């Protein structure tokens, strides 16, 4: 039997991709194609993304179950997944919409994360699963479709797998803000905050990695106080680049949001009591 969860919060492709396609040369992450070529590229990319989503869900559901929810014959789904054929754009839209009703991404994440001891959140089952990361990255791509993103910025170290999956999906470079300097790099952008023990925590990004013309998506796996996120914002602002937004895999509490002056999408929100 198919488990169908509510997935109404995810924006439908018809509401995202068609407007993006019309003005694609102005909106897609850093690509400078002629408008006609860009339209075809974006449409094809979406059709291929639907196939990838089918492949990911095939690990959890049978062809019979996928056929039941999408209305596509099992034999055709099999050919999509094996790469023999690809769906038309309209068919891809219908499949995407149907699959969104099939799985609640928040429920999937909650099933894999663990709360250990006094509020410690273990995401190891998520960040070590490349299929799960790819599925979440596609969700993030849909959230930010229509916004220009040229770089993904993430603080080291735990959020790197999550940020890598997102950068690959957006097809843009990944910039890592590290806690230590590389002796081979001379110029850095720095950002600091005061830690829980009154120690100063500093992040470093090579200056050449973020330019003024960039539009940056900030990514992190867990946010508790918002201090690291605010530091990432400062780093981008120091080079006068544009912040496209921020996406957080797990947010604990909501008080920290009051001090963040950029759009933030939190995929899974946990209660303040976990701090």
Say what each PLM segment does:
Residues 218-238:
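Active-site/ligand-binding-proximal alpha/beta "capping" segment
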Residues 37-57, 65, 81-148:
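Active-site-facing substrate-recognition patch
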Residues 27-43, 47, 234-275:
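PRPP-dependent phosphoribosyltransferase catalytic core
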Residues 62-70, 77:
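Short alpha-helical "recognition helix" segments of helix-turn-helix
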Residues 172-216:
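Short, glycine/charge-rich flexible loops or terminal/linker lids adjacent to PRPP-binding catalytic cores
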Residues 1-41, 215:
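N-terminal flexible/basic segments that precede or flank functional cores
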Residues 149-156:
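Short glycine-rich phosphate-binding loop at a beta-alpha junction
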